[in-house]
């Protein structure tokens, strides 16, 4: 009976240990040179672009599976090829600047083999262009 109890205990313990696999975080795989970019004041209707540069700090190639944004006004583009160990890659982020207002948008980066997404941020303020302001005043 003791042997059965010990065997069952050992089995439960080993399953519990195996279930606690170490989760890899994005910061363990890549290092971004910046995680936030402020465009400052930009003219309405003038799209702006920023490249978030990152370095693969792991010993395996990194694949960016997906890049998405918090709204349709922000368009991220991911590298199509794997980024080798020690190499750098870029995430292109374009903001359309259609609406006059301050903005704070998030870009979500999904890396292969990493459960949690990396979140990048862009901020700024879209101001009315002088042409739009003049047209409104003349009406």
Residue ranges: model-predicted function:
Residues 1-23:
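Bacterial Sec-dependent N-terminal signal peptides
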Residues 20-46, 53, 115-139:
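Long, low-complexity ectodomains and other extracytoplasmic segments of secretory-pathway proteins
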Residues 37, 87-93:
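Short strand-edge motifs at loop-to-beta-strand transitions and within beta-strands
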Residues 54-58:
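Asparagine-centered strand-capping/turn motif at beta-strand->loop junctions
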Residues 59-85:
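Surface-exposed binding patches on compact interaction domains or structured appendages
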Residues 96-101, 112:
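Short, surface-exposed loop/turn segments at beta-strand-coil junctions that are enriched for proline
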Residues 109-115:
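Short, exposed beta-strand-loop hairpins at the edges of beta-sheets
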């Amino acid at each position: 009976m003791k042997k059965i109890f010990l065997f069952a205990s050992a089995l439960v313990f080993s399953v519990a240990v195996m279930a606690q696999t170490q989760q890899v975080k994005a910061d363990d795989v890549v290092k971004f040179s910046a995680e936030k970019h402020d465009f400052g004041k930009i003219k309405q209707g003038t799209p702006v672009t920023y490249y978030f540069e990152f370095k693969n700090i792991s010993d395996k190639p990194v694949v960016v599976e997906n890049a998405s944004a918090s709204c349709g006004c922000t368009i991220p583009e991911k590298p199509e090829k794997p980024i080798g160990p020690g190499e750098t890659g870029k995430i292109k982020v374009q903001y359309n600047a259609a609406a006059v207002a301050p903005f704070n948008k998030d870009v979500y980066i999904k890396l292969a083999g990493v459960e949690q997404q990396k979140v990048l941020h862009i901020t700024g303020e879209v101001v009315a262009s002088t042409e739009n302001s003049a047209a409104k005043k003349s009406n």
